Amino acid sequence: MIVGFNTLFCEFVRSYNNLCLIFFTLGQESLTYAMKKTNYLLFLLLWITVPKAFGQLEQSIRVEFAKDAKDEEELDVTPLESEGVLVTVKKIDYFASSPFVWKFTKYDTQLKEKWKAEFKVGFGKNPLLSYHNKQYLFWLFGDPDSDDISIHRLDLSTGETEEIEGQILGVEVVSHFKVLGNTAILAGKYREKPVVAMFSFFDKSTKVLPAIYTSNMEIVDLEVDDEAQQVIVFSRSLKLKTGCQLTIRRYAYDGKLLFTNAFPANEDRTLLTGKLMPIHPNEYLVIGSYAASCSSYSQGIYVTKVKGDESFPVKYIEFSEMANFFNYMKPKRQQKIQEKIARKKEEGKEAHFRYMILVHDFVKTPDELVLVAESFYPQYHNTVNVVNPLSRSNADRVNGFKYTHALICGFDKDGNLRWDNSFPLQDLETNQLGPQVQISYQQNRLVLAYPKEGKINTQLISGSKVVKEKEEFEVKTTYENEKILFADNASLAAWYDQYFLAWGFQKIESTKDKNTSQREVFYLNKLTYKSNDGRAKL
């Protein structure tokens, strides 16, 4: 028989009162003993019946791809939300007539195959960048010795492929690649100056966007607004004498400059990065990081708005002003930092803390906007010129990145900070700089997850409160009695609803049958964060 908690609780209280009445007739000592016992039972009943706010990560479906030991292969995974996932196996064979072979497989949310496709690229063009929207995946290839490019377009619904060839004039080094409608937008450098060019799929013409090709400037980001049919360019001037400034320029589909929003240095504070969230037509909320002077080290988060050519006042939020920014530290160190901040305030000064941070795109929940930023620092190794050890070519080169902690902030629709939180990443290391922490919104809580050393780490928060501390989960193999000997290139993405996708490379052996040969596979795992009721939908 299933009864509600209220009914069960009322019956317990009724029995509790009757029991106390009986023991009252036996004396005070018996009454005290009865109350202690029944209070313990009441606590136990409440602990059992009150729903727990905890969950756990479970693996529901797994797909494996045998790795070809003969060819150089890479696995690329593109989550498509509720439309499924696209898996790209990139094969490189420099002795073949077509050295680059891209093989695509589209899966549904149950990881069942929907279609397969492939395209081949001959000698002379190297893979540069990719971009996808809801309809297509685009791959950009370029000839390092000429202006020739080719763009391969893959229809995500049918698997049909198309190659678009042409020449992109005025771009020597490509750093950003986006597509708006039937126009590709490439950002990069030409003769050491920043440039953004548009390439038409129809007439193969090239158009350079105005007001960008100038000295002492760098392109920070390139975005497209499909709904407004606009190209958005973030650039930062690097003039030390007059001060650095962030500028946002928005262009029409035909390349015409529509709006310019410049944010010059304000009290020695300059904006570093920016993420846009549309509010109304031609009106955006802008949130990003800012620094002191022209430094590349952030000392806080800023919030502002732009509407047409109008820029609204900027609100600055110092890291030291955030309630939980230093929660990633150990208690003793955190206490020392808080004492330092208090001393600075008594002296009438501000305590500044500077970090290199990577700001993610917004995650929109029903009630707020969530921003994730990760603190990192590059790792270097020195390359020595053996012929001349004193040569200027002996320079430190970036050899990967280490992440120290993640900052999570919640903003309302007007850009007001509602809460902040942070947690350590414990020196997570990657070869390339990119977002690591993935978040999934579930039942008014946020599941934070990131991969490390072939495992998945999770933490559950509700605003500034930690609901469940960090947990570590193994990425399981297909069969029992198997052991993972080696794991590499572990990646994770928030997929849809409460689901995550994990993928990477594993070398596996059987612990039951030693005669079975080891296998090397690319894997794709669907992970589910179980809800409070203990059930996980597939």
What kind of region is each of these model predictions?
Residues 64-102:
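Beta-strand-rich domains and repeat architectures in extracellular enzymes and scaffolds
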Residues 262-273, 318-335, 345, 350-353, ...:
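Conserved blade-ending motifs and adjacent loop-strand segments that build the rim/top face
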Residues 69-77, 122-131, 168-179, 215-224, ...:
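Repeated scaffold domains used in trafficking and secretory/extracellular systems
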Residues 101-109, 151-157, 198-201, 245-256, ...:
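Beta-propeller blade signature
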